[in-house]
């Protein structure tokens, strides 16, 4: 899957939220190192497994987006195992959707911050049980603090997109952790104070990025 290219109004290419986080946040490396070590000791090809996990997550996101907006997903480029696990994650999303009163306003929204010079793509802005939130779908085995930093940055993107008119309307955020092995989901809810922390951390990472040589 091709990476999204973000450009500002002067046609300058900008780094994405995930690139800035992954390239500058030191504490998010431990989990990946531990995961890689575990699979290497088991004789697994850790890079192959990591690539496969990314493809499964991408496919699950596509399935969710097509369900929300209508349409179908081409499965030709995916293996049977990737399709099976992505479908399991998708079924978890569908169960969450049926368990709650959900109204979607935006999905896969690609935005650029002219003020802070970065770009990002949000999974969804939706109303869940009467609360307007940012929603993010994750197929990872755990929830990590950098996800909250990511959401803090997305909130900034969204509020700039609406000229700050919607700042007070966003009530929080939800990370929906989707199981790839058996149908199910976990909801991780975050308040405005949590998003404020995430944005504070992201601005520090921006400073590091700006001062790199």
Q: Each predicted region: which residue ranges?
A:
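Metal-dependent nuclease catalytic cores that hydrolyze phosphodiester bonds in DNA/RNA
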Residues: 1-119
